[in-house]
């Protein structure tokens, strides 16, 4: 987008249905999942395909609203099943090295409907 261009960075984006999108095998150095709230079964499937799609040493950077975000009014889905728990998400990356894990409150400024103190879960993992 415009921010990347202004910084002289090339970014390729795709709009796709994650239920069927082919991420490939050992194709990516990094995968970013920011506030991508999926039903648990689909999330597990997408994460498994994501790890398979990483090259050795590749990383996944993940952030989503945690279970305690419900009712805060600062963003996130209103369905409890779409919110995540850190321990649950850790288990979805078996065999990966955890580089960063956090569950707690932080200020979120992602636009008009996602602003204020939010309970987030962050995880950065590396494929061996």
Language-model segment annotations:
Residues 7-18:
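Conserved SAM-binding strand-loop segment of SAM-dependent methyltransferases
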Residues 19-30:
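A short acidic, Gly/Pro-enriched loop at the edge of an enzyme's catalytic core
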Residues 80-103, 121-122:
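Short alpha-helix
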Residues 38-50:
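A short, conserved alpha-helix within the catalytic core of class I
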Residues 19, 37-38, 64-70, 104-106:
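Short "lid" loop at the C-terminus of a central beta-strand within the Rossmann-like core
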Residues 49-54, 93:
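Class I S-adenosylmethionine-dependent transferase superfamily signal
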Residues 109-128:
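Core SAM-dependent methyltransferase catalytic element
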Residues 57-65:
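Conserved beta-strand signature within the Rossmann-like core of class I S-adenosyl-L-methionine
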């Amino acid at each position: 987008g415009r921010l990347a261009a202004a910084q002289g960075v090339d970014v390729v984006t795709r709009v796709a249905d994650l239920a069927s999108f082919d991420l490939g095998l050992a194709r990516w150095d990094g995968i970013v999942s920011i506030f991508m709230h999926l039903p648990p079964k689909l999330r597990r499937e997408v994460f498994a395909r994501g790890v398979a799609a990483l090259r050795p040493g590749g990383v996944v950077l993940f952030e989503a609203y945690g279970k305690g975000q419900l009712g805060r009014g600062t963003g996130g889905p209103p369905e409890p099943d779409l919110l995540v728990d850190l321990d649950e998400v850790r288990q979805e990356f078996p065999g990966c090295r955890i580089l960063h894990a956090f569950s707690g409150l932080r200020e979120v400024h992602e636009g008009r409907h996602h602003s204020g103190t939010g309970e987030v879960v962050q995880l950065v993992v590396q494929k061996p």
